[in-house]
Amino acid sequence: MAKLSKMAQAKRKLKFPVRQYNRCPLCGRPRAFLRKFQMCRLCFRKRALQGEITGVIKSSW
C-alpha cells in the first residue's frame, strides 16, 4: 500500500520541478531506472530474457 501511495505522489506535479523523479510503472521501484525503456533494471531484465523487448539480446563473449 505504501508503494502505491508513493507512485501516486510521484505522478503529481511538484512545486519545484527539480524534485521530480522517475519510478518504474510496473513495480514502483524508484532506483535503477532506465530512461530509454521507462522501467527499472529488474523489470527490464525479466522482460528482456522473456523476449518482450525487441532488439535486446543477452551478450556473451
From Swiss-Prot:
Keyword Metal-binding attributed: yes
GO molecular-function term, one example from the UniProt record: rRNA binding
Biological process terms in GO annotation: translation
Co-factor binding details: Binds 1 zinc ion per subunit.
Keywords: Metal-binding, Ribonucleoprotein, Ribosomal protein, RNA-binding, rRNA-binding, Zinc
Co-factor(s): Zn(2+)
Transmembrane intervals: none
Record GO cellular component, one term: cytoplasm
Ligand binding (Zn(2+)): 24, 27, 40, 43
Name of one Pfam family that matches: Ribosomal_S14
InterPro entries from the UniProt entry: Ribosomal_uS14 (IPR001209), Ribosomal_uS14_bact (IPR023053), Ribosomal_uS14_CS (IPR018271), Ribosomal_uS14_sf (IPR043140)
Domain of life: Bacteria
Purpose: Binds 16S rRNA, required for the assembly of 30S particles and may also be responsible for determining the conformation of the 16S rRNA at the A site.
Similarity comment text for this entry: Belongs to the universal ribosomal protein uS14 family. Zinc-binding uS14 subfamily.
Assembly with partners or alone: Part of the 30S ribosomal subunit. Contacts proteins S3 and S10.
Name of the protein in its database record: Small ribosomal subunit protein uS14
Organism of this sequence: Anaeromyxobacter sp. (strain Fw109-5)
